Amino acid sequence: MDDNDDWFTICDEKNIMLEKNNNNEYKISFNINLKGGEDTVINVLKNGQLFELLSALNPDVIDKITVTEHDGVHSVFMTLKNSDQADGEEVDKIINVYFSLKYNFKENKCIITSKKNENENNDEYHSDIKKKYGKDFLHVSKIKIKVVEKNNKTSVCITFKTDIQKSNNIKNMFIGLYFKKIFYRFKQYFE
């Protein structure tokens, strides 16, 4: 993603910023003031507990996360839901997303980037996913999660692109807002 893209703010509440550009790329950025101890963002990432923690912190938003690892690449299948029941529906706005990630650690820094599967644009690949999980998954690409810890402060910047046709801007926005909500609770967990 190009830092020179024109980003506009969707939401900047609770010290966590959600921005979007015209290419359906989203950026979530926030700082965490660590309360001390061994439970740091970097340690959670190193121990492979990120998605387990996100799921535990967001039972009303994340219905299910399945993570498989092969050759250092983590394939993540996530079902997002809205079950606040404010509109009288028991569960609605279910969105299934998937992405593949590669982790890179250096001292007090972790950079997670999306790793494209050669078969992702292949109809047979999508058919195999649907057969395996019983549902269609929307691909989220160009993911970059940069985490830097310094002096009891952690800076997190997450960028990603939704691979949904422009005509479905509402679904794009839901994914951006769901991810913001998920990572807001992640931020709260460490503070």
Language-model regions: role of each:
Residues 2-191:
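Eukaryotic helix-grip
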